[in-house]
Amino acid sequence: MKKFKLLLLALMCVAFLPSKADEGMWLLQLMQEQHLADRMKAQGLLLEADDIYNPNRVSLKDAVGIFGGGCTGEIISPDGLILTNHHCGYGAIQQHSSVEHDYLTDGFWAKSRKEELPTPGLKFKFVERIVDVTDKVNNKVKSGEVKEEETFEYDFLKKLADEELKASDLNGKAGISAQALPFYAGNKFYLIYLKTYSDVRMVAAPPSSIGKFGGETDNWMWPRHTCDFSVFRIYADANGEPAEYNENNVPLKAKKHLAISLKGINEGDYAMIMGFPGSTNRYLTQSEVKQRMHSTNEPRIRIRGVRQDVLKKEMAASDKVRIQYASKYAGSSNYWKNSIGMNKAIIDNKVLETKAEQEAKFAAFAKAKGNTDYEKVVSEIDAAIEKSNPILYNYTCFREVFQGGIEFGTPYLILDKLKDAIKNKDKEAINKNIETLKKVYADIHNKDYDHEVDRKVAKALLPLYAEMVPADALPAFYTTIQKDFKGNYDAYVDHCYDNSIFSNEANFNKFIKKPTVKAIEKDPMTAYVRAKYDLMDKLGNELAESMKGMDLLHKTYVRGLCEMYSPEPKAPDANFTIRLTYGNVKSYNPKDGVHYKYYTTLKGVMEKEDPTNPEFVVPAKLKELYEAKDFGRYALPNGDMPACFLTTNDITGGNSGSPVINGNGELIGAAFDGNWESLSGDINFDNNLQRCIAVDIRYVLFIIDKLGGCKHLIDEMTIVE
C-alpha cells in the first residue's frame, strides 16, 4: 500500500510548467486532481472542468460515445443524430450496399426519418459512470482472495465488474453494463458503466470518392482533403431507453449534444478532443520497441501486403467482390500502412535512442532511491523479451495468415459431436447438430465472402507462411502438402476448397441428407482446421509461458517512471476508455525546407483529381459546386472552401470520429487520422511532429447541405455563427 500511495502522489501532483503542446490521453475523472483545467485554460479553454466532466450533472462527456466496435461518435442534435467518420461507418454502408444500391460509390442521403436505414448489429455506447475501485482490488490482493498477477486477467476483472454492477443502483436498468479495467499498468483500477443503444440507423454518407478521397495513397498523410464523415441516428423506446429495433422506436432525446461552430479556426486556436483511443504503449522499454518492430510489424507488413495484392486485383475485376471486400480491405490496409510508417518513424525520430536515455535516467533514479525492484526491472523485462521474440514472431505470422488472412474453415468441434451422435445412433443429437451446421454454413458463405477469392488468398499465403517460419511452427497439414501433393500448394488448396463438406451448397446438402462418419473423417478442410487450431494452442501457450510475470514487471516499471517524473503528471496508456486530449491548431515542419500549413481547402481536391485513379476521382456534382463557388455560409472569409486541418492533439486508433472542440465547447471538426511523420507516436510522443488530422465541420455541413441536399439535417443542429 505504501508503494501505491507514492504512485498517487506522482499521478496527482502537478508542476505548473509553461504551456506547450500537450502529450497525454487524460482520464476525465482525474481532471481536478491533476489540475488539467488550469493548463487547458492557459492554452485557450473558456469552460470550467465541470462543463467537460461532471459525475453529478450533464456535461460534454454525455455527447460522446463509442460508435460500433472501435470508433468514437458524437451527438450533434437534440434528436440523437450521430457524427462519426466515413471509415467508421464504412462497414454499415457496405452492409446496406449491393450492386443495385451501391451506397459505397453513390453515397446515401435519407431525405426523411422514414428513409433512415436500420443497421442490425450496430451499437452506440455512452459512459454513464466511472468509479475508482483500486482500493477494492488491493484489498482483495491483501486478503489473499486473489493473487496480484491475477488482477490483470479477464476472469477476475469480469467477476469484479459483475459484483459491482449487481450492488449498484444501475443494476437491471436497460442497456447498462459494466467493465473493470487496469490503468497505469495495474497501479489503478476503474469500473466503467456503459449504456448501450442497439437501434442505430444510417442517415447520411457521402460517396467514397468524397468520404475516402485519397484512399490508401493519402492514408496517414498530410496535406489531406478527405471529407471523412458519416451520419447515423440513435433510436430508443418511448421512454428514451435502449431497445432492439422496432418500427415504433423514436429518435433519442439526447441528454447533451454539441453545438457546431461556423466561426472558423486560426493558427494557435485551442482545440481538445474527447474520445476512445484504443491502445498506446508509451511505457515500453527499448527492447520492447525493437520487438514491436521486428516480431509484430515486419511480419504483418509482409503478409498483409501479399493478401491485399490478391484482394485488390479481384476487387478491380468485379463490382460484387469490390463491395464484399471493401471493409475488409480497408481495415487490413490501414494497419499495414501504419506498421510501415511506425517502423520508419521509430528510426527517423530516434525513438530507440530516447528509450535508452530514459532507461539510463531510470537506472540512476533507482540506484539513488535504493529500490532494488526498480534497479532490476528493466533487465528482467529485457530477458523476457529476448525469450519471447521468436515465439511472438511465429504467433504474429500465424495470426496474420490463418486468422486474419484465410477465411474458409469448418466447425470441427460440431462435426466431432455429430460423429459421436452418428456412432451412437442418437437421432435427436444428429438432427440438433445438423441444424447447427446449417447456421454455420450460412455464416461461412455470408454475403461478404467469395469462395474463389478466398481460394486465391490461400494459394498466396500458404507458401509464404512456410517461407517465413521455422519447421516447428508449421501446422501438421504442411506434411500432407509435401507427402500427398508433392509440395504443390495450389493442388492442396483446390483439394480442400473443392472437396470439403462446406465447399459449396451441393456438397453440403448431399452430406446433411445422409451424414456419415466416413465423410467427416475424410473432409480435407476439417483436417486443415484441426491442425491449425492445434498449432494455435501450442504457440499461444508458448507465448504465455515466455511472457509470464510481465504484467507485474510493467506495473513496477510504470510506477517507478511516474515517481521519477513526479510532480509532472503522466497519463496512462490508452485502453479504449474515454479520454481527453488538449492542444492547439498548428502547422508543422516535417523536414528541412518543408512547411505544412494547418489547413487545406477544396482547391486541393481539384488539384489532386485523377479520373484514371479510383482513389482520386472527383464527383461531377462536387466539381459543379466548386466551379460555381456555391459554398454558402461554410466558406472562408476569402471565399475558399475549407477541407481539413491540423491540431497538436494526442490521438490514436479508436479516436476516429472523435469531436474536435474549441475553447467554447463547440464542434469544429472530426478527427480521422494522424500524420506519417509521427506514426511512432503510440510509443513515443513528439511535440514537434505529432499532429491530429481532422475534417473541418464546415466541409462536412457543406457536403450534407449542398451535395446531399439534406438541409433538414442542418436545421436540427445547433449552429453558432
From Swiss-Prot:
What GO annotations for molecular function exist for this entry? dipeptidyl-peptidase activity; serine-type aminopeptidase activity
**GO process terms (BP):** peptide catabolic process; proteolysis
Provide the top EC class.
hydrolase
Task: Give the range the annotation lists for the signal sequence.
Answer: 1-21
State the organism named in the record.
Phocaeicola vulgatus (strain ATCC 8482 / DSM 1447 / JCM 5826 / CCUG 4940 / NBRC 14291 / NCTC 11154) (Bacteroides vulgatus)
Summarizing the function annotation, the protein's role is:
Catalyzes the removal of dipeptides from the N-terminus of oligopeptides. Most potently cleaves the synthetic substrate Met-Leu-methylcoumaryl-7-amide (Met-Leu-MCA), followed by Leu-Arg-MCA, while this enzyme does not hydrolyze Gly-Arg-, Gly-Gly-, Lys-Lys-, or Gly-Pro-MCA.
**What are its E.C. numbers?**
3.4.14.-
> Per its UniProt record, what Gene3D superfamilies does this chain match?
Trypsin-like serine proteases
* UniProt protein name: Dipeptidyl-peptidase 7
Report the transmembrane regions from the record.
none
Which is an annotated Pfam family here? Peptidase_S46
Family according to the record: Belongs to the peptidase S46 family.
The alphabetized UniProt keywords are: Aminopeptidase, Hydrolase, Protease, Serine protease, Signal
Q: Where is this site: Critical for substrate specificity of DPP7?
A: 674
Carries keyword Protease?
yes
**Catalytic machinery residues:** 87 (charge relay system), 228 (charge relay system), 656 (charge relay system)
